Amino acid sequence: SRGEICNITDSLQFISEKASTFISNWHTRIYRHAPRLFDAGYQRAESHEDIFCEGTPIYKLLSSGAERMYQYIRSAGYDNIICTHVFPALALTEMRRQHPCLQLVTSHISTDYTCAPCTADSALDWYFIPSTSLLGEFEQCGLQPQKLIASGIPVRQQFYQRVSQEAGKANAGISPAHQHILMM
């Protein structure tokens, strides 16, 4: 919004193109077509957060591209890295462990209304969270309160524009006579 340029990169590609395709495709397939399986996996991750800790097989896989990530960031001269998922946050944490002299500002934007499993296993400068009502939850998960910023979730400007109910229904393909409710 202030004219800053932001490049978007798939952090899983630093592991490998095949790993990125595999992880992304299966993640999407499971949550779309097997939501109960996705929920079970998420609940398992919540109750066994140590599966993402440094030294575990999952951590080693997710952070295995840390050196390639470092080379990419260094060669492009980036000074601010923003993660929108915990997987790149873990890889970035490992990269910073391996290269502590690299001057960067790092942050994570939590796009869930909860502290996702393994968020606290990352070590970034800032954590942007959706609401002040979640400060306690993120602190309870192990994040330092001075690193938490309740900023809301960034959305496109068009979502701030009010439209009439009739226009909204027409835009969404909902019959004007249809009674509906949106729950979040």
State what each model feature region is:
Residues C101, P117-Y127:
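A conserved, positively charged/aromatic
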Residues S16, A89-A91, T114-P117, L135-G136:
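Short, well-ordered alpha-helical microsegments
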Residues S1-E4, P100:
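A short, Lys/Arg-enriched amphipathic alpha-helix followed by its capping loop at the start of a domain
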Residues Y72-D79, I174-A177:
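Glycine-rich phosphate-binding loop signature in dinucleotide/nucleotide-binding domains
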Residues D125-M184:
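A nucleotide-sugar donor-handling region in carbohydrate enzymes
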